[in-house]
Amino acid sequence: MNRALRKVLLQAGGVARFGPGAVPWRTLGTVSEGNNKGAQQHYDIIIVGGGMVGTALACSLGKNSRLQDKRVLLLEAASGFKQPSIEQYSNRVSAINKNAHRLMKRIGAWEEIERTRIKPVLKMQVWDACSDALITFNYDDFSDNISWIVENDVLLASVYRQLETVPNVEIRYSAKLADCTLVRDGAERSTVQLTNGELLTCELLCVQSL
């Protein structure tokens, strides 16, 4: 999860169609240009995709004391977030390593995850496909759990609840991406075109697939 967060930070430069690749960091600044659909709306950071990575990134940025004066927009294509059923288990789960565990604790989501439903991994066995070689990791070999298994819906719900407490992060549902361009070589801004015709601009554009 942390690896995905690091890979998705994209910054703009000359106009180019959206594609992979990182561009140099530059200072973020806030510019207000109105909120009507006919005008460009400017944000410091736009995150496309409200899955686990996108919401965790938005929450982490919003709770960063150095970025509290920056406007962050999270775009989610779904019509809204549905709270998971406590009684019904989901078979869509993720293994949370210690880096992701620290991230969840830092943004305040881990305590709720623990209260809802979680299972620690106490033993792991890795073997070679072409031989009988294998290695086993046991809980007894470490001072902490190897990792934790968490349902995706439980993790997402906990992070969304933390997002509700962050004033500088805006969430838009039913926001589907039609096109976007990145800026290169000193051009001013990245642009995001939504399917409803809205045009958004930003200093930093992050696109998530998870």
Roles of regions detected by a PLM:
Residues 116-210:
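Conserved N-terminal helical subregion
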Residues 86-129:
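N-terminal FAD cofactor-binding segment of flavoenzymes
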